[in-house]
From Swiss-Prot:
Disulfide bond positions: none
Molecular-function annotations in GO: ATP binding; phosphoribosylamine-glycine ligase activity; phosphoribosylformylglycinamidine cyclo-ligase activity
Main location: cytoplasm
Catalyzed reaction equations: 2-formamido-N(1)-(5-O-phospho-beta-D-ribosyl)acetamidine + ATP = 5-amino-1-(5-phospho-beta-D-ribosyl)imidazole + ADP + phosphate + H(+)
Cellular component annotations (GO), alphabetically ordered: cytosol
Full protein name: Phosphoribosylformylglycinamidine cyclo-ligase
EC code(s) of this entry: 6.3.3.1
UniProtKB keywords: ATP-binding, Cytoplasm, Ligase, Nucleotide-binding, Purine biosynthesis
Superkingdom as given in the UniProt entry: Bacteria
Pfam short name (any one): AIRS_C
UniProt xrefs under InterPro entries: PurM-like_C_dom (IPR010918), PurM-like_C_sf (IPR036676), PurM-like_N (IPR016188), PurM-like_N_sf (IPR036921), PurM_cligase (IPR004733)
Subcellular location field: Cytoplasm
Length: 342
C-alpha cells in the first residue's frame, strides 16, 4: 500500500503547483524575493517608511463555499477570500503587501482548485498584493467529494504616524458608507436556510432581482476597496477612522473604529438597500434587527471624516465609481448605534 492508495496523490499535487505557478507569479511585486516552492516566502519591506508598522489579518469565506461548490462555480470565492483579508487590513490605513492562502480538500481536483486560485490571483491584482505562497492540503475522509475549505492571510504596511486606530475619531464627525456589491461573504448559513426552507434552487429568479438568479447574485464577489481607499488616504481627504462591515453587520463592526465614549447616530433610510436583502427578509420572514445584525445591508465599508469634509468625500468616492452615502454622525455614547433600534 502507498500514499496514493490511502487517498493522497502527491504527484497530482506537484502538477497542480506547476499549473498555477505562472498565474501566481503574475501577482509578484518588485519586493518579492525568490519564487514558489521554498519553505517560506520572502518579501523585502518597501523603502520610504520612517517607522513602518506591519498589519496582519486572516479570514475565510464561510459557508458561501457551499453555494460555490453546489453550482460548480469556484472563481468568485477566490476573490472573496482576498477581499475579506485585505479590506480588514485596510481599515488601519495599511497598504496590503502580500497574501497567503490555505486550501484543504478531500480529493485534489486540479481544474476546480485552479479556478479558486485564479480568483485569488484576480483579487491580488485588484488589491496590488503579491500572492507570496500557500498550502494545498489533500485530506481524504475529512472532506466529502468536491468539498474544500479556504483560509487567507494578509500582511500590509503603514507609517506609524498614519496608523488609524480609532483615536482620531471625534464627536460630530460624519459617517460615510460605501456601497457593497451584495451579500459579500457573511450570513450564508442564514441564506442557505431561507432557500432550503422555501424549497427553492439557486437557479430561481425572483422578480425583484430582474432576471438574475439567486445563485448569480449571491456569488457576486466581495467588493475590494483597496484602490479607492489608498488613493483617498494619499489625497487631501482627512480620514479619521474606517470599518469593514462583515459578520455582525453595522452594529458589530462600526463601533470597532470608535473610542469608548462614542456612538453613531444612523439614518437607516440614507442609503440603498439592495434587492437581494429585501428578498431575503421577505422570503425568510427575517426581522429588521436580525437582518442588520447578520448582513451588511448594502454598506460594505465605512469611512469617518470631519463633518466639513463630508460633501467632498461623498463626491470623491462617487466620482471614483463607488457609491457613497452620508449615513450618520459620531455622537457621545458607549458604542451603541442609535437609529437601528428595531
Amino acid at each position: 500500500m502507498d500514499y496514493k492508495e490511502a487517498g493522497v496523490d502527491v504527484e497530482a499535487g506537484r502538477n497542480f503547483v506547476e499549473k498555477i505557478k505562472k498565474k501566481v507569479e503574475s501577482t509578484h511585486r518588485p519586493e518579492v524575493l525568490g519564487g514558489l516552492g521554498g519553505f517560506g516566502g520572502f518579501f523585502q519591506i518597501p523603502s520610504g517608511y520612517q517607522e513602518p508598522v506591519l498589519v496582519s489579518g486572516t479570514d475565510g469565506v464561510g459557508t458561501k463555499l457551499k453555494l460555490a461548490q453546489g453550482l460548480n462555480c469556484h472563481h468568485t470565492v477566490g476573490i472573496d477570500l482576498v477581499a475579506m483579508c485585505v479590506n480588514d487590513v485596510l481599515t488601519s490605513g495599511a497598504q496590503p503587501l502580500f497574501f497567503l492562502d490555505y486550501l484543504a480538500t478531500g480529493q485534489l481536483n486540479p481544474q476546480q482548485l485552479a479556478e479558486v486560485v485564479e480568483g485569488i490571483v484576480e483579487g491580488c491584482h485588484l488589491s496590488h498584493c503579491a500572492l507570496l505562497g500557500g498550502e494545498t492540503a489533500e485530506m481524504p475522509g475529512f472532506y466529502g467529494v468536491g468539498e474544500y475549505d479556504l483560509a487567507g492571510f494578509c500582511v500590509g504596511i503603514v507609517e506609524k504616524s498614519l496608523l488609524l486606530d480609532g483615536s482620531q475619531v471625534q464627536i460630530g464627525d460624519a459617517v460615510i458608507g460605501l456601497a457593497s456589491s451584495g451579500v459579500h461573504s457573511n450570513g450564508f448559513s442564514l441564506v442557505r436556510k431561507i432557500v432550503e426552507t422555501q424549497g427553492l434552487s439557486w437557479d430561481f429568479c425572483p422578480d425583484i432581482l430582474e432576471g438574475k438568479s439567486l445563485g448569480e447574485v449571491l456569488l457576486t464577489p466581495t467588493q475590494i476597496y483597496v484602490k479607492p481607499i489608498l488613493e483617498a488616504l494619499s489625497s487631501n481627504l482627512k480620514i479619521h477612522g474606517m470599518a469593514h462591515i462583515t459578520g455582525g453587520g453595522l452594529p458589530e463592526n462600526l463601533p470597532r473604529c470608535l473610542q469608548a465614549n462614542q456612538s453613531v447616530q444612523i439614518n437607516p433610510n440614507s442609503w440603498e438597500i439592495l434587492p437581494i436583502f429585501t428578498w431575503l427578509a421577505q422570503a425568510g420572514q427575517v426581522s429588521p434587527s436580525a437582518m442588520f445584525n447578520t448582513f451588511n445591508m448594502g454598506i460594505g465599508f465605512v469611512v469617518i471624516v470631519p463633518v466639513d469634509q463630508a460633501e467632498t468625500t461623498l463626491n470623491w468616492f462617487n466620482n471614483k465609481g463607488i457609491k457613497a452615502y452620508q449615513m450618520g454622525e459620531v455622537i457621545e455614547g458607549t458604542g451603541h448605534l442609535v437609529g437601528l433600534d428595531f
